[in-house]
Amino acid sequence: MGSLINIDTTPANGLPRPKRSKMEIYSDILGAIKLELIDGEVKPIRIQAKSNLAYDKLTRYLGELEGRKMITTNPLGLTVLGREFLQDYDRIKGFLDEMGVKYLAGQEGGPR
């Protein structure tokens, strides 16, 4: 599994955006499904656009998520486990983001 922390990719740092980890992709897909459920019917093409994946990759990840019992596919929706994953992932990501700000912000040239 890759890193859970995103690197700032603004033009100021000039770094390319790192590839997303599988957990980030799962979170993006599950989050897109959650948003679509609020609006009504969940359409795969809208999940594809919101999760920024090619359709063949989206199909593969949907199969993985169904196998892990995080989604239902007919109709497309979240299971309790999928909702729990999103809550836990968001909590962990928030914690890691806070740590990055606390320990890494402004450290360039500062006291060690």
Description of each model-found segment:
Residues N52-G67:
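Short amphipathic alpha-helical interaction segments
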Residues I38-K50:
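Short acidic, hydrophobic short linear motifs in intrinsically disordered regions
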Residues L15-Y26, K43, L76-F95:
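Short, cationic-aromatic polyanion-contact patches
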Residues M1-G2, I29:
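Secretory targeting signatures
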Residues E66-G77:
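A short, conserved structural fragment
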Residues G2-G14, R91-R112:
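Amphipathic alpha-helical dimerization/coiled-coil segments
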Residues M23-G40:
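Short amphipathic alpha-helical interface segments
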